Regions:
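Conserved small/polar residues in nucleotide/adenosyl-binding loops
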Residues: 1-5
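A structural signal for well-ordered alpha-helical segments within the folded catalytic domains
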Residues: 7, 14-18, 89-96, 112-115, ...
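Beta-strand elements within well-structured catalytic alpha/beta cores of enzymes
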Residues: 9, 13, 20, 37-42, ...
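Non-transmembrane alpha-helical segments in soluble domains
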Residues: 10-13, 17-24, 28, 95-99, ...
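Histidine-centered active-site microenvironments of extracellular/periplasmic hydrolases
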Residues: 25-78, 90, 216
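Short, solvent-exposed loop/turn segments at the edges of secondary structure
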Residues: 33, 50, 64-68, 89, ...
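Polar, surface-exposed loop/tail segments
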Residues: 34-36, 81-144
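Long, internal low-complexity/basic segments
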Residues: 94, 146-147, 155-157, 163-216
Length: 216
């Protein structure tokens, strides 16, 4: 990142921080800060021009650099300060979490894909089994995370990684653990069969070309 870009990036971070401060100050001013759940998280992946070290990949990748994001939850009435959780989750879990936190439930006719994280918010040491699935047409990518293990397919090649020892996804364990690979592949395929198919014409653009630009 060049000096000019670094300066712009610092200004963007400062502006974001200031905006979050305004929101939190407004909650305090209205006397509802203690009983309000505030979640700060991110869009998936680093941009293609960024450095996501120590992770590999960025947007349009199902490697960890393309899908792993941070989140911070603030809710003084229910969350103790300073807690850190190892629980795996997805953004869709926040819908279920917010509903449970508010004493509501999803319409049975429209079940949620997410799982409530409320027990984790109240006790960061609490964890539960939470397999995570991904798929995308770009490069025929698919992924499944179960515990520390991750199954990944890119361009027709299957990989198996132990992220507890290899978060950069450099050591493919598939040749050494064929049974685990097969089980995770079958698991992913069963999940995929339960989902609507991805339209054949669902494509992505890795950058702006003339046809993507507004009319001039």
């Amino acid at each position: 990142m060049c000096i000019r870009d670094s300066h712009t990036y610092r200004r963007m971070i400062a502006q974001m921080d200031e905006g979050i401060g305004w929101v939190l100050a407004a909650l305090e001013r209205h006397g509802v800060a203690r009983d309000t759940l505030v979640v700060f998280t991110s869009d998936n992946g680093g941009e293609r021009f960024s450095d996501n070290w120590p992770l590999v990949g960025g947007k349009m990748d199902l490697t960890e650099g393309g899908i792993r994001v941070p989140w911070i939850a603030h809710w003084p009435a229910s969350i103790a300060a300073g807690g850190v959780s190892e629980q795996m989750c997805m953004t869709m879990d926040w819908s279920a979490t917010m509903l449970e936190a508010g004493g509501a439930s999803a319409d049975p006719a429209y079940p949620l894909d997410g799982v409530s994280l409320l027990p984790v918010l109240r006790d960061p040491a609490h964890t539960f089994e939470r397999p995570l699935y991904w798929r995308m047409n770009h490069r025929g990518q698919r992924a499944l995370r179960r515990g520390p293990w991750k199954y990944l397919r890119v361009d027709g090649h299957d990989y198996l990684f132990d992220l507890s020892a290899d978060e950069r996804e450099r050591a493919n364990r598939a040749p050494r653990e064929p049974a685990r690979l097969d089980a995770m592949r079958v698991d992913w395929e069963a999940w995929n069969a339960s989902m609507p198919p991805i339209p054949d014409d669902a494509t992505v653009s890795l950058g702006y070309g003339a046809k993507n630009m507004p009319q001039r």
